[in-house]
Amino acid sequence: MVHPVKLGRNVRMSYSKIDEVIDMPNLIEIQKNSYEQFLKEGFKEVFKDVNPITDYTGNLILEFVDYSLDEPPKYSVDECKERDATYAAPLKVKVRLINKETGEVKEQEIFMGDFPLMTETGTFIINGAERVIVSQLVRSPGIYYAMKIDKAGKQLFSNTVIPNRGAWLEYETDSNDVLSVRIDRTRKLPLTVLVRALGYGTDLEITELFGEDERILATIQKDSTKTEEEGLLEIYKRLRPGEPPTVESAKALLHGLFFDPKRYDLAKPGRFKFNKKLSIAARIHGFIAGENIKDPDTGEIIVAEGETISREKAETIQNAGVNTVILRVDGKNVKVIGNDMVDIKRYVDFDPKEIGINEKVKRDVLMEILEEYKGKGDDAIKKALQERIDDLIPKHITKEDIISSISYIIGLSYGIGSTDDIDHLGNRRLRSVGELLQNQFRIGLSRMERVVRERMTIQDLDVVTPQALINIRPVAAAIKEFFGSSQLSQFMDQTNPLAELTHKRRLSALGPGGLSRERAGFEVRDVHHSHYGRMCPIETPEGPNIGLIGSLSTYARVNEYGFIETPYRKVSKEEPGKVTNEIVYLTADEEDEYIIAQANEPLDEEGRFISNKVVCRYKEEFIEVDPSKIDFMDVSPKQIVSVATSMIPFLENDDANRALMGANMQRQAVPLIKTESPIVGTGIEYRAARDSGVVILAKNPGVVEKVTANEIIIRTKDGKRDTYKLLKYMRSNQGTCINQRPIVKKGEEVEAGDVIADGPSTDNGEIALGKNVLVGFMTWEGYNYEDAILISERLVKDDVFTSIHIEEYEAEARDTKLGPEDITREIPNVSEDALKDLNSEGIIRIGAEVRAGDILVGKVTPKGETELTAEERLLRAIFGEKAREVRDTSLRVPHGESGIVVDVKIFTRENGDELAPGVNKLVRVYVAQKRKISVGDKMAGRHGNKGVISRILPVEDMPFLPDGTPLDIVLNPLGVPSRMNIGQVLEVHLGYAAKALGWKVATPVFDGATEEDIVQTLRKAGLAEDGKSILYDGRTGEPFENRVTVGYMYMLKLAHLVDDKIHARSTGPYSLVTQQPLGGKAQFGGQRFGEMEVWALEAYGAAYTLQEILTVKSDDVVGRVKTYEAIVKGENVPEPGIPECFKVLIKELQSLCLDVKVYSEEQEEIAIKESVEDDLEELNVNIEGREDEVNFNEFNDIGEEITDEDLEVEDFDLQDLNDDDINPDDTIDAELDDNLFDDDFDDTFDDDDL
């Protein structure tokens, strides 16, 4: 029954029935562990891969000895955000240069660039912006077998050998039973050609190797080569057509393709998958032995002929070093060949993990070492094993692997082995931050290696130093490029704490080396049975990326090979049917071998299954089994879903499509001024807030000594003082407000890990994305048609859904060719009234209220001028630069924006701030707005029930309860049945009862309150059991006809606010080529009157309207200015002229070499002006709202050298790239020429009226 649960500082009444035996892991460990692993091991591995670099003669040897990243970063995290710097520490590498001729050894420590560090919360600060590296789901290296059925109904098998890097090998069978191979995506060859090239030259050797199989015989027949040499030459001809083939070069080519660790790399996961797939044990168990199987060392028979091989015996066979087994299948003997790898534990007495071996090793190498060091003690063996670890666990493919993989494809047609499913999570792995960085670092180092080699040949051998050989630029560039512009390095979604957390746990199948949106079919995107407990089946974007981007499940973790594991409770083998508290993490392919019970299966006190038959999962099926057959049990019902999904109460009663929207919309909830945790929660809110990193946690236990809005001081047990600084009104990446508030009092005792301050969207340490409001499900005068929402004015008056949004504006004073720009209060042609809030330097004061068009930073730019005469130059020289012409390029508040200036930051060269080249001063102004909820804003519940506010009713008109309480929100009941998200109705019922009892409740997903529980809680609260109530119409006081479902629902205000979307324009910028208005709010564009709209006007015969829209309101350059003047002066609108698109058409025809002339009705030729500028000069009126056409070469003359810094990727903004004539340095200015202003024009035509 319902019981209290303590979550942090809060107590919730929980309806859960299952005791969870394991705590949830830290939710951002996927980021942190991966990065730490990279710092510890990744660097070493990469350096080991490039070591040593030798010159072409082998005389100079350069090796990387050691590295350090210990120095503290130059700036703290907060300073980096403020200064647009990267949070990074210097990477120093110790390099040794050995000259073999002279025996001279030089060592030097070399700085290899700044390496970005991860913050406490799992993010990176790159150029001042907080970014997240998303983990990538890719196909694991390994061997994959597939089957297709041809027209005759025959099974054809094929396989692909995929390395981490290197050439692919693909085998296939055709309908004539001929086996062929493609090497590195070239044309097909008979497979026996490859086998011959590997050293099995004659037909006899091949048939002895694989047995007398019809496929092998058919292939031999088709194969034109007959010896090893011929095989090698045949392969060489295929791969290097046009070069003279020799046996030597062919051998070298084959070796370079597959057996050179520098060019062919399986990586750890690849070797692991190879051994798993090709191991003889996995292939023979369950089959009948065709001959006696003997231990090669002792000669004893492990399995006798005709005996069925058990799993245990199969393991024994493999570890005894038996590599070939004859099986009897349907009366035929079939030969199965393994890849000769054994478990080292059977051969040595110590634990091989001590020396870093935890996979199978190559038998022949192991035997060689053990023979050599027999009787010399364990330490000698350990040392020898460590020295030859690359031979024991080869990183490249081996000859045995290739032979074994061919044996596998032959065995498949006898039913030995199995084909693979590429979408199974056992065959897909994660590349997390660490590995992605390691790959990038490797690319940088290999580019550097080339440079080092070249320099070794050029430089004087006697005086050469490591520093002179090494150029760190390629390394620094590779890292910078990865963080700045990789598809997987993303600008952090910081709308609210849940958005941050989810972003760090995201799994993407896109990105370099992954899939592309266009190529991904349905299968890849589908939910797969192996996703259970690893990847959330609910949370994924709607749209083109659906199914390609997922989210890690709550309990999942990533193992050392990059496969996702999920925890299970072990069922005791000694007492079948009894569940222990031992936790085992399984990967997807391990899980496929076991039968697993659900977490909500009832157990008795001792942990035994109560039912005689238990519904379980086995692979992709649900089966009913006896309790004694069960191997594992789920640890928690919420282990299958992600964090965001597990925050939806009554998820089990919602349709999956709507739950998907609910999970995604929680990430878009805007932080409100006053937060309030949900009455109906799921109990995960506390953990999510704690791990998201927005709340402050006490580092050490102690007593609170001082609390202010800005800092908390805690005196620890050993008398030290810990000071915690709080963030106040900072701007997030998405423009929402980050603000922390203390929740402890002076004198309070705290433990380490306790929440001591709330962040945005958290309440008392729990995530609080919205508000609990009283809703009723009823229609009201059609105002909630089509999911619209009717709200009470109380939500506006009491600031229930009010949020703060902070916008950042920046102005920089640069050096131009005509002289430096100046930030100043002296601006030409600006009234004193417009300058009233600027200080003496021309920068707005903090606290000033600003509207659209107000000046934030006064700035003037020198104007271009004609060549001066000698006299003028002399006067200039005598009287200084005062007479210079300047134009106003001040930073103004853009159209439609307003607010209060909350902060101003000034960076100058004089103060030692690092600025971009050519910038002398940078000013950042932060403007905050309080946005109350308004008509047009989007709101949503947690069940995918979203809508737009259609009307705000006065409180007195809202329907009210019998005790006089008015509703806050009226929702449409028709939004529930067809969408099948019944969870919202249950939430409302439970919220109604819980509010009446003064409870906050937790109803965990798949383990929450049942209908019975809700009815009982309603009864306990003294409310009607159906959760309905009589409502009275606020306007008349009459009761409504039927009783209405009312209760408390948790509603979110989403980031789609109407203020950011509404937009109007009378005149503004035009596109350069077509002279039509630009489009979109960002460009201050117009509304497109498209083809279909034109048809509508044509259909009505509205000729004049149509003419106007196609000419003066669009691209008739002269006509639109004349029309504008006519409106201002109150005259009649003139006749339209020739639209620009007509001129463009003529130009297009002329470009096809057609001589086109234009004639009037009187047969007179009309001169078409060549360029718009000719027209504009005659008109001398500018309605575009900017001073003059943008000059692209203003700051970068062809003569100037463009430096790397100018091309910084970060500086690009997509909106700047949208149109060719928008220059990011030019603020679009909607001011009109002064001489045009007329008082009544100003009154009648106002932006607010639009």
UniProtKB/Swiss-Prot annotation:
Signal peptide: none annotated. Transmembrane segments: none annotated. It comes from the Bacteria. It is an enzyme of class 2 (transferase). Residues 1215-1250 are annotated as: Disordered. Its EC number is 2.7.7.6. Keywords: DNA-directed RNA polymerase, Nucleotidyltransferase, Transcription, Transferase. GO terms for biological process: DNA-templated transcription. GO terms for cellular component: DNA-directed RNA polymerase complex. Pfam families: RNA_pol_Rpb2_1, RNA_pol_Rpb2_2, RNA_pol_Rpb2_3, RNA_pol_Rpb2_45, RNA_pol_Rpb2_6, RNA_pol_Rpb2_7. SUPFAM superfamilies: beta and beta-prime subunits of DNA dependent RNA-polymerase (SSF64484). One of its GO terms (molecular function) is ribonucleoside binding. InterPro entries: DNA-dir_RNA_pol_bsu_ext_1_sf (IPR042107), DNA-dir_RNA_pol_bsu_external_1 (IPR019462), DNA-dir_RNA_pol_su2 (IPR015712), DNA-dir_RNAP_su2_dom (IPR007120), DNA-dir_RNAP_su2_hyb_sf (IPR037033), RNA_pol_bsu_bac (IPR010243), RNA_pol_bsu_CS (IPR007121), RNA_pol_bsu_protrusion (IPR007644). It catalyses: RNA(n) + a ribonucleoside 5'-triphosphate = RNA(n+1) + diphosphate. Belongs to the RNA polymerase beta chain family. The RNAP catalytic core consists of 2 alpha, 1 beta, 1 beta' and 1 omega subunit. When a sigma factor is associated with the core the holoenzyme is formed, which can initiate transcription. DNA-dependent RNA polymerase catalyzes the transcription of DNA into RNA using the four ribonucleoside triphosphates as substrates. HAMAP family: RNApol_bact_RpoB (MF_01321). This is DNA-directed RNA polymerase subunit beta. It comes from Acetivibrio thermocellus (strain ATCC 27405 / DSM 1237 / JCM 9322 / NBRC 103400 / NCIMB 10682 / NRRL B-4536 / VPI 7372) (Clostridium thermocellum).
